[in-house]
Amino acid sequence: MTLKAVFFGSIGSFSETSRLQLDSFNESMKINQIDEIWDEKEYIGYLKISGGINRLKSILSKQMDENILQKIHYDKTKIFQQKILKSRSLIRPGFEQLCEELLANNVLLGIASTTSLQTIENILLGLKSIKISDFNFIAHSGTVNKQKPDPQVYKICLEELNVQEIESVAFEDTTSSLNSVISAGIKGIAIPGNLSLNQDFSMAQIKLNEFSDIDFKGLKELL
Protein backbone atom coordinates (compact mmCIF):
# COMPACT_ATOMS: atom_id res chain seq x y z
CA MET A 1 0.00 0.00 0.00
CA THR A 2 1.26 3.48 -0.89
CA LEU A 3 1.46 6.06 1.88
CA LYS A 4 -0.11 9.17 0.34
CA ALA A 5 -0.85 11.41 3.34
CA VAL A 6 0.20 11.96 6.94
CA PHE A 7 -1.96 13.99 9.29
CA PHE A 8 -0.88 15.72 12.46
CA GLY A 9 -3.91 16.20 14.65
CA SER A 10 -4.32 18.34 17.74
CA ILE A 11 -1.67 21.04 18.17
CA GLY A 12 -0.18 18.93 20.97
CA SER A 13 0.77 16.28 18.43
CA PHE A 14 3.41 18.57 16.91
CA SER A 15 4.05 21.17 19.65
CA GLU A 16 4.40 21.15 23.43
CA THR A 17 1.90 23.67 24.75
CA SER A 18 -0.04 21.97 27.55
CA ARG A 19 1.46 23.94 30.41
CA LEU A 20 1.01 27.20 28.49
CA GLN A 21 -2.63 26.29 27.97
CA LEU A 22 -3.10 25.49 31.66
CA ASP A 23 -1.68 28.89 32.61
CA SER A 24 -3.91 30.54 30.00
CA PHE A 25 -7.05 28.87 31.37
CA ASN A 26 -6.20 29.99 34.90
CA GLU A 27 -5.48 33.57 33.83
CA SER A 28 -8.71 33.73 31.86
CA MET A 29 -10.79 32.43 34.76
CA LYS A 30 -9.18 35.02 37.02
CA ILE A 31 -9.93 37.82 34.54
CA ASN A 32 -13.54 36.65 34.42
CA GLN A 33 -13.72 36.51 38.22
CA ILE A 34 -14.13 32.74 38.38
CA ASP A 35 -12.99 31.50 41.76
CA GLU A 36 -11.21 28.42 40.46
CA ILE A 37 -7.59 27.52 39.79
CA TRP A 38 -6.61 24.31 38.03
CA ASP A 39 -3.40 22.63 39.11
CA GLU A 40 -1.29 20.41 36.87
CA LYS A 41 -2.60 17.17 38.35
CA GLU A 42 -6.20 18.23 37.69
CA TYR A 43 -5.38 19.43 34.20
CA ILE A 44 -3.81 16.09 33.28
CA GLY A 45 -7.24 14.57 33.88
CA TYR A 46 -9.00 17.35 31.97
CA LEU A 47 -6.84 16.63 28.90
CA LYS A 48 -8.95 13.51 28.35
CA ILE A 49 -11.60 15.96 27.09
CA SER A 50 -10.84 17.24 23.58
CA GLY A 51 -11.18 20.94 22.84
CA GLY A 52 -10.88 23.89 25.19
CA ILE A 53 -14.56 24.86 25.09
CA ASN A 54 -15.59 21.24 25.69
CA ARG A 55 -13.22 21.16 28.65
CA LEU A 56 -14.82 24.25 30.16
CA LYS A 57 -18.35 23.00 29.53
CA SER A 58 -17.62 19.65 31.12
CA ILE A 59 -15.98 21.10 34.22
CA LEU A 60 -17.80 24.40 34.79
CA SER A 61 -21.13 24.08 32.95
CA LYS A 62 -23.17 23.18 36.04
CA GLN A 63 -22.45 26.57 37.53
CA MET A 64 -21.89 28.74 34.44
CA ASP A 65 -24.00 30.46 31.82
CA GLU A 66 -23.10 29.50 28.24
CA ASN A 67 -22.13 33.09 27.41
CA ILE A 68 -19.70 33.21 30.32
CA LEU A 69 -18.11 29.94 29.23
CA GLN A 70 -17.65 31.31 25.71
CA LYS A 71 -16.08 34.49 27.13
CA ILE A 72 -13.65 32.48 29.27
CA HIS A 73 -12.65 30.44 26.23
CA TYR A 74 -12.29 33.54 24.05
CA ASP A 75 -10.03 35.21 26.62
CA LYS A 76 -8.07 32.01 27.14
CA THR A 77 -7.39 31.80 23.39
CA LYS A 78 -6.14 35.39 23.26
CA ILE A 79 -3.88 34.87 26.28
CA PHE A 80 -2.59 31.58 24.84
CA GLN A 81 -1.75 33.17 21.49
CA GLN A 82 0.21 35.91 23.25
CA LYS A 83 2.16 33.31 25.21
CA ILE A 84 2.95 31.39 22.02
CA LEU A 85 4.36 34.50 20.36
CA LYS A 86 6.51 35.25 23.41
CA SER A 87 7.89 31.71 23.57
CA ARG A 88 10.78 30.22 21.71
CA SER A 89 9.83 27.51 19.23
CA LEU A 90 7.32 25.07 20.72
CA ILE A 91 7.70 22.60 17.85
CA ARG A 92 8.37 19.07 19.10
CA PRO A 93 11.82 17.55 18.42
CA GLY A 94 12.08 15.60 15.19
CA PHE A 95 8.82 16.94 13.74
CA GLU A 96 10.42 18.99 10.99
CA GLN A 97 12.91 16.26 10.11
CA LEU A 98 10.10 13.74 9.64
CA CYS A 99 8.12 16.22 7.55
CA GLU A 100 11.18 16.85 5.36
CA GLU A 101 11.53 13.11 4.72
CA LEU A 102 7.82 12.78 3.92
CA LEU A 103 7.96 15.73 1.52
CA ALA A 104 10.99 14.19 -0.19
CA ASN A 105 8.88 11.06 -0.76
CA ASN A 106 5.93 13.03 -2.17
CA VAL A 107 3.70 12.39 0.84
CA LEU A 108 0.98 14.98 1.44
CA LEU A 109 1.00 16.73 4.82
CA GLY A 110 -2.14 17.78 6.65
CA ILE A 111 -3.05 19.24 10.02
CA ALA A 112 -6.32 17.95 11.47
CA SER A 113 -6.95 20.38 14.30
CA THR A 114 -10.12 21.95 15.67
CA THR A 115 -8.38 24.88 17.33
CA SER A 116 -8.28 28.36 15.80
CA LEU A 117 -6.30 28.94 12.61
CA GLN A 118 -4.53 31.88 14.25
CA THR A 119 -3.26 29.65 17.06
CA ILE A 120 -2.03 27.03 14.60
CA GLU A 121 -0.26 29.62 12.46
CA ASN A 122 1.35 31.24 15.51
CA ILE A 123 2.78 27.88 16.57
CA LEU A 124 4.01 27.14 13.05
CA LEU A 125 5.92 30.42 13.04
CA GLY A 126 8.47 28.42 15.03
CA LEU A 127 9.26 26.23 12.02
CA LYS A 128 12.82 26.47 10.72
CA SER A 129 13.50 23.93 7.99
CA ILE A 130 10.00 23.66 6.53
CA LYS A 131 7.27 26.23 5.80
CA ILE A 132 3.59 26.57 6.59
CA SER A 133 2.97 26.32 2.84
CA ASP A 134 4.43 22.79 2.89
CA PHE A 135 1.18 21.63 4.50
CA ASN A 136 -1.33 20.74 1.82
CA PHE A 137 -4.32 21.33 4.08
CA ILE A 138 -4.82 22.79 7.55
CA ALA A 139 -8.14 22.04 9.24
CA HIS A 140 -9.09 24.38 12.09
CA SER A 141 -12.06 25.52 14.18
CA GLY A 142 -13.58 27.26 11.18
CA THR A 143 -13.46 24.06 9.15
CA VAL A 144 -15.63 21.92 11.44
CA ASN A 145 -18.74 22.12 13.58
CA LYS A 146 -18.01 19.01 15.62
CA GLN A 147 -15.18 18.53 18.10
CA LYS A 148 -13.09 15.39 18.52
CA PRO A 149 -13.59 12.52 19.23
CA ASP A 150 -16.07 12.98 16.38
CA PRO A 151 -14.25 11.97 13.15
CA GLN A 152 -15.56 14.93 11.12
CA VAL A 153 -12.23 16.77 10.94
CA TYR A 154 -10.45 13.70 9.55
CA LYS A 155 -13.17 12.98 7.01
CA ILE A 156 -12.83 16.56 5.77
CA CYS A 157 -9.04 16.21 5.56
CA LEU A 158 -9.33 12.99 3.55
CA GLU A 159 -11.74 14.65 1.13
CA GLU A 160 -9.62 17.79 0.75
CA LEU A 161 -6.48 15.79 -0.05
CA ASN A 162 -8.38 13.22 -2.13
CA VAL A 163 -6.89 10.23 -0.32
CA GLN A 164 -8.39 7.08 1.16
CA GLU A 165 -8.30 6.10 4.83
CA ILE A 166 -6.05 3.14 4.06
CA GLU A 167 -3.54 5.43 2.31
CA SER A 168 -2.92 7.63 5.35
CA VAL A 169 -1.84 7.67 8.98
CA ALA A 170 -2.36 10.25 11.72
CA PHE A 171 -0.52 11.37 14.85
CA GLU A 172 -2.43 12.37 18.01
CA ASP A 173 -1.34 13.17 21.56
CA THR A 174 -4.45 12.27 23.60
CA THR A 175 -6.81 9.30 23.79
CA SER A 176 -9.88 11.36 22.92
CA SER A 177 -8.28 12.78 19.78
CA LEU A 178 -6.91 9.37 18.81
CA ASN A 179 -10.46 8.01 18.94
CA SER A 180 -11.31 10.56 16.24
CA VAL A 181 -8.64 9.01 14.02
CA ILE A 182 -9.83 5.45 14.65
CA SER A 183 -13.48 6.40 14.01
CA ALA A 184 -12.45 7.86 10.65
CA GLY A 185 -10.88 4.52 9.67
CA ILE A 186 -7.31 5.86 9.71
CA LYS A 187 -4.34 4.14 11.35
CA GLY A 188 -3.54 6.14 14.48
CA ILE A 189 -0.14 6.82 16.01
CA ALA A 190 0.06 7.99 19.63
CA ILE A 191 2.69 10.60 20.43
CA PRO A 192 1.70 11.85 23.92
CA GLY A 193 2.89 15.17 25.28
CA ASN A 194 4.35 15.84 28.70
CA LEU A 195 0.94 15.91 30.39
CA SER A 196 -0.75 13.05 28.52
CA LEU A 197 1.90 10.36 28.96
CA ASN A 198 -0.22 8.17 31.22
CA GLN A 199 -3.35 8.03 29.08
CA ASP A 200 -4.46 4.70 27.63
CA PHE A 201 -3.25 4.50 24.03
CA SER A 202 -3.92 0.79 23.55
CA MET A 203 -6.02 1.51 20.44
CA ALA A 204 -3.03 3.06 18.64
CA GLN A 205 -1.06 1.20 15.98
CA ILE A 206 2.06 2.31 17.81
CA LYS A 207 3.00 4.66 20.64
CA LEU A 208 6.05 6.90 20.19
CA ASN A 209 8.00 9.07 22.57
CA GLU A 210 9.42 11.34 19.86
CA PHE A 211 9.15 11.79 16.11
CA SER A 212 12.71 10.51 15.76
CA ASP A 213 11.37 7.08 16.76
CA ILE A 214 9.88 6.58 13.29
CA ASP A 215 10.64 7.39 9.65
CA PHE A 216 8.98 7.17 6.23
CA LYS A 217 9.67 3.44 5.95
CA GLY A 218 8.25 2.79 9.40
CA LEU A 219 5.08 4.71 8.59
CA LYS A 220 4.58 2.75 5.35
CA GLU A 221 4.82 -0.49 7.30
CA LEU A 222 1.87 0.55 9.47
CA LEU A 223 -0.53 0.50 6.50
Question: What are the residue ranges of the model-derived segments?
Answer:
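Asp-based, Mg2+/Mn2+-dependent phosphohydrolase catalytic module
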Residues: M1-L3, S116-Q118, N122-L223
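N-terminal helical cap/lid subdomain that shapes the substrate entry/recognition surface
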Residues: T2-P93, E101-N105
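Ser/Thr-glycine-rich phosphate-binding loops at phosphate-binding pockets of nucleotides
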Residues: S13, T17, S113, S177
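Substrate-recognition element of Asp-dependent hydrolases with the DxDx(T/V) motif
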Residues: F25, F95-L127, V181
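Residues at secondary-structure transition points
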Residues: L47, N67, K86, L90-P93, ...
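Short, structured helix-loop boundary elements
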Residues: L69-Q70, R92, E96, I132-F135, ...
